């Protein structure tokens, strides 16, 4: 419960009630070519960079009497044009590392001139924190965005490494690259974060996910929303949401990179994207391989020969763009991994080390297919937009060893959503969701049979967004969800017998309220500004397949969270310096635990009787004195505690005591990131710092007792040299000073490792 899970090697298949969504999608598709265009006024102009030269490829977005913000990019001469309904709108222009203040203009003007300025944190249009695209400056929730440019500058290959730059999230990796990687959002458990790839859920049944299985080679950006988001996404978004938005469309562009490094590392990727007036597409391939830890095991000096890992990924998308703003998009992704499982061979605090496992391996294969249709009801410059989505996600997992097992997750999802501008300042969204998912695993039955656990959810949601100008944004949303677990046959296993369960249904309602207010706008181009934001919401995570399979409790309910937060964003020097401070308080209720010695609290083996809380503060500082230099730092103070179980004051689940810290959540953690970009040279340095954590005995988990895991600081240094316009050489040294540490007790991190390679980019 309080999280000693290293990985759940495990499963999920689907039970589908998505037929109505298929019918809706087909009906929507049939109307795409016939929708009439609304009357529209052109809005156009030119975007210039800080040097007064045309800013090609800058993003221009307009909010006003529209269902969703209208967006375009500038051409090679910095020019843009948008067709808009008559009226006054708010225009924003931005590019990586720079933006311009929002301006109010009347549709119909074609002579606008907007000049960008260097910003420590530039504007970006986010798609994860609300039902429609929202500028970062109007987000009431805590949102961080990692761009493709930032990932490339730091030579980041994995989602786990990227998230070490985000305040409030603790990343715990069981060794080197490719090993099991978990994330803890603001003190929540490792299955409290929903991960999306272009809107498709990547989590297993019940919310678990190994981040090492989520590549970022094709990511245009990574959006991270902290705090519960079940009002938007329902189940599993109990502690936060991470979304990988892949690149597509635009001018023809192809990239390829390859590198080699210590421990026989071989990494490579290739991407291509292109688009025109009526179509857009993209494709990507990536591969990562590394031998991992190959020296003597710190626990007893024996050889470690089974710590290697491999990941292969492929993805593609193709979309059609109609003259009236219609969109049809299909996308797919495939990821498979293969890694050794030597077990814990590092710290051995209780002397229970049983030797290195030289034969066990874990294999996974994930497949995702998604279809998306958008129909503005009245043309591109419309007050109303209809959107329909359908996606399929399958995950197969196999563990090969003396106690091998197979598992699978199957999920089918359908969604219909209507977005509308009720007035020039009020936007509304409403819709319905259907999710069918199932999980199977031979581990549950300790045999060849696969127990099927099937669950469906039908939800209705609504959201209102009030934006009376460019300084204030208030968003309120709610989602009501009916979650049904199908009847489950009895399991007579002597290991963990379970009676037959009848079908079980629960209804959950989750609200969310956020507000962002620019209290003091910058009075001059080099002035200061002050922005306040607040957010409150709730979240749920229904039981995973193991929790259902190993209980005798037919009414096991979802785990729940409640959260409030407040933040202050202060900029100086026209945005070249930004300080962002947030305080938060999270309460986690109805956590599922094994009742064990807590007699009198429940008549079942497991029940929703545990509770915990987490409170803390996050501070992020960013400084960009000029376009070539950027510095960022963040610090998180986190105070977590195990609370009394329901019905037993003063008692906590074994081996905890009331007031103990939650596992693997440090009180102090932070990071520092420096980059410099010259005409042909580039350099970066990143540092991650983590304080002491409470952890479990590596070999027997919580049954072996609780132990302290020392903190650490790790530095990575790197740089790149552009030899020609299309060819760049790069190198980096991970763990440059050879720190000895363990994210997860018993699993040593890799020492100093050198990587070197090249990147080729071509565009037309």
What are these model-derived regions, one by one?
Residues 59, 63, 94-96, 109-152, ...:
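Short, acidic, small-residue-rich periplasmic hinge/interaction motif at the N-terminus
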Residues 135, 143, 160, 164-201, ...:
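Extracytoplasmic beta-strand/coil segments of soluble accessory domains associated
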Residues 230, 243, 259, 271-362:
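Periplasmic-side early beta-strands and strand-to-turn transitions of outer-membrane beta-barrels
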Residues 122, 323, 423-435, 451-586, ...:
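Structural signature of Gram-negative outer-membrane beta-barrels, strongest in the C-terminal barrel
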Residues 279, 381-399, 518-520, 531-537, ...:
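Membrane-embedded beta-barrel scaffold of Gram-negative outer-membrane proteins
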Residues 65-79, 83:
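Short, acidic Ser/Thr/Gly-rich low-complexity loop/linker segments typical of extracellular
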Residues 1, 467-475, 482-483, 585-587, ...:
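Gram-negative outer-membrane beta-barrel transporters
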Residues 200-226:
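Short acidic/polar hinge/loop motifs at secondary-structure boundaries
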């Amino acid at each position: 419960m309080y999280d000693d899970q290293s990985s759940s090697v495990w499963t999920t298949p689907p039970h589908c009630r998505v037929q109505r969504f298929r019918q809706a999608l087909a009906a929507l598709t049939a109307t795409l070519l016939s929708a009439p265009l609304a009357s529209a006024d052109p809005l156009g102009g030119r975007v210039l960079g800080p040097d007064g030269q045309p800013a090609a490829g800058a993003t221009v977005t307009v909010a006003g009497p529209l269902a969703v913000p209208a967006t375009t990019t500038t051409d090679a001469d910095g020019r843009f044009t948008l067709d808009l309904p008559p009226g006054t709108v708010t225009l924003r222009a931005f590019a990586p590392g720079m933006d311009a203040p929002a301006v109010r203009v009347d549709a119909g003007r074609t002579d606008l001139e907007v000049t960008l300025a260097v910003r420590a944190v530039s504007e970006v249009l986010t798609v994860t924190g609300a039902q429609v695209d929202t500028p970062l400056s109007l987000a009431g929730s805590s949102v961080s965005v990692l761009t493709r440019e930032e990932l490339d500058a730091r030579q980041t290959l994995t989602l786990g490494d990227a998230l070490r730059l985000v305040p409030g999230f603790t990343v715990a990796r069981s060794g080197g690259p490719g090993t099991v990687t978990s994330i803890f959002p603001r003190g929540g458990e490792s299955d409290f974060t929903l991960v999306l790839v272009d809107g498709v859920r990547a989590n297993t049944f019940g919310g678990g996910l190994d981040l090492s299985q989520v590549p970022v080679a094709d990511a245009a950006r990574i959006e991270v929303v902290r705090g519960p988001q079940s009002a938007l996404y329902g189940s599993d978004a109990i502690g936060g949401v991470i979304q990988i938005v892949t690149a597509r469309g635009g001018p023809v562009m192809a990239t390829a990179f390859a590198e080699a490094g210590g421990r026989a590392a071989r990494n490579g990727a290739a991407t291509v994207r292109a688009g025109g007036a009526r179509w857009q597409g993209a494709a990507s391939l990536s591969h990562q391989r590394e031998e991992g830890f190959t020296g003597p095991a710190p626990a007893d000096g024996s050889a470690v020969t089974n710590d290697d890992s491999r990941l292969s990924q492929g993805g593609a998308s193709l979309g059609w763009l109609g003259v009236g703003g219609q969109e049809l998009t299909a996308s797919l992704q495939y990821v498979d991994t293969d890694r050794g499982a030597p077990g814990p061979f590092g710290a051995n605090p209780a002397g229970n080390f049983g030797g290195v496992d030289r034969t066990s391996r874990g294999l996974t294969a994930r497949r995702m297919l998604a279809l998306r249709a958008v129909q503005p009801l009245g043309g591109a410059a419309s007050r109303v937009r209809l959107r329909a989505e359908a996606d399929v996600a399958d995950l197969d997992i196999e563990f090969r060893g003396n106690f091998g097992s197979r598992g699978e997750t199957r999920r089918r999802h359908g969604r219909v959503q209507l977005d509308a501008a009720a007035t020039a300042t009020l936007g509304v969204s409403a819709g319905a969701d259907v999710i069918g998912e199932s999980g199977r695993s031979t581990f549950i039955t300790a045999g060849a049979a696969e127990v099927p656990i099937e669950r469906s959810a039908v939800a209705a949601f609504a959201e209102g967004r009030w934006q009376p100008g460019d300084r204030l944004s208030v968003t309120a949303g709610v989602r009501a969800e009916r979650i049904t677990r199908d009847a489950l046959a009895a399991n007579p296993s002597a290991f963990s017998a379970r009676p037959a369960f009848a079908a079980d249904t629960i209804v959950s309602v989750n609200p969310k309220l956020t507000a962002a207010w620019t209290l003091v706008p910058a009075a001059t181009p080099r002035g200061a500004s002050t922005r306040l934001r607040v957010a409150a919401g709730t979240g749920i995570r229904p039981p995973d397949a193991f929790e259902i399979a190993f209980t005798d409790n037919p009414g096991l309910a979802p785990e729940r969270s409640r959260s409030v937060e407040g933040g202050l964003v202060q900029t100086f020097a026209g945005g070249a310096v930004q300080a962002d401070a947030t305080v938060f308080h999270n309460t986690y209720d109805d956590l599922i635990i094994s009742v064990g010695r807590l007699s009198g609290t429940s008549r079942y083996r497991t029940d929703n009787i545990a509770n915990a809380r987490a409170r803390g503060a996050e501070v992020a500082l960013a400084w960009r004195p000029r376009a070539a230099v950027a510095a960022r730092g963040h610090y998180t103070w986190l105070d977590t505690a195990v609370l009394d179980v329901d019905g037993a004051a003063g008692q906590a689940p074994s081996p905890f005591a009331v007031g103990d810290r939650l596992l693997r959540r440090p009180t102090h953690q932070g990071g520092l990131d420096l980059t410099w970009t010259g005409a042909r040279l580039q350099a970066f340095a990143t540092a991650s710092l983590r304080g002491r954590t409470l952890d479990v005995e590596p070999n027997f988990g919580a049954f072996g007792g609780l132990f302290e895991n020392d903190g650490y600081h790790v530095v990575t240094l790197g740089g790149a040299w552009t030899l020609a316009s299309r060819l760049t050489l790069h190198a980096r040294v991970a763990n440059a000073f050879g720190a000895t540490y363990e994210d997860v007790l018993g699993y040593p991190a890799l020492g100093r490792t050198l990587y070197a390679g090249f990147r080729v980019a071509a565009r037309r």
